[in-house]
Amino acid sequence: MIVTTTQHIEGKKIIAYKGVIAGEAILGANLFKDLFAGIRDMVGGRSGTYERELERARTIAFQELEQKARELGANAIVGVDIDYEVLGQSNGMLMVSASGTAVVIE
């Protein structure tokens, strides 16, 4: 399946629009992971823990997006947008949402 942020796919003709679709992932952050990530951030390093969790959430959101497109009979997704949000009173949850338009291409 082709997934792109652009509205068109070069060299391909869109023959049917199946609708707007979305995929989301919400992950809770572990207290100890948060503590060590905060310490690393204070000394100027990158937080590998958060980067891995972010990648995992993004993967889940895109898998859900592709699954919904297939259920509609689409073979591509155009106009993909991805958003990140920190949720919860103590910012203990991460939400990644992806949306786009499911289409059929030749």
Swiss-Prot record:
Extract the Pfam families matched here: YbjQ_1
Any transmembrane segments, and where? Answer: none
Mind telling me which Gene3D superfamilies this protein's record contains? Answer: Hypothetical protein apc22750. Chain B (3.30.110.70)
State the SUPFAM superfamilies in the record: YbjQ-like
Family named by the database record? Belongs to the UPF0145 family.
PANTHER family per record: UPF0145 PROTEIN YBJQ (PTHR34068:SF1)
Q: What is this protein called?
A: UPF0145 protein VVA0283
